[in-house]
Amino acid sequence: MLCGLICAGHPQAEGVWLAEVEPVFPQGDLLAEAATRQCLADLNDLAKRTRAGIEGPEIGLRVLLPTEEAPLRERAEAVYDWCRGFLYALGLAGVGERDLSGDTREVFRDLSDITRLDLGDLDEGEENEAALAEIVEFLRVAAMLFHKERVAAREWA
């Protein structure tokens, strides 16, 4: 979701994202309040690193997904969830398919297609591993393409 908000050019991307994911603990519980402060600090750090990866001079975005040691199904479900979050964020930022150029419109449709995949019969295997690796790389490039079109192009104009 955070990547989608940043790539869509939402002016308050981090704040909107934090409002969606911020943990809520009972007030008056000092341990919970300390945990909340630490969690928020960690989330803010993640937001800064994500923005730096997207906006930095090098292609440094790292899509936050389970490691390759995780089962294939778990990683595929995380990709599915990442795509849903990215598309949800575009909607929050007011970006629809009609607002996109040909390339990003195609990427938008591809991301949407990923959210409709049936992961129920996904088998472990080299072919599926290779396909998932390609999709993960596609996500990274897709996010950068959205940012280039929605944000960077306006900054350079």
PLM segments and residue spans:
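Domain-length accessory/inserted modules outside core catalytic folds
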Residues: 1-83, 87-157
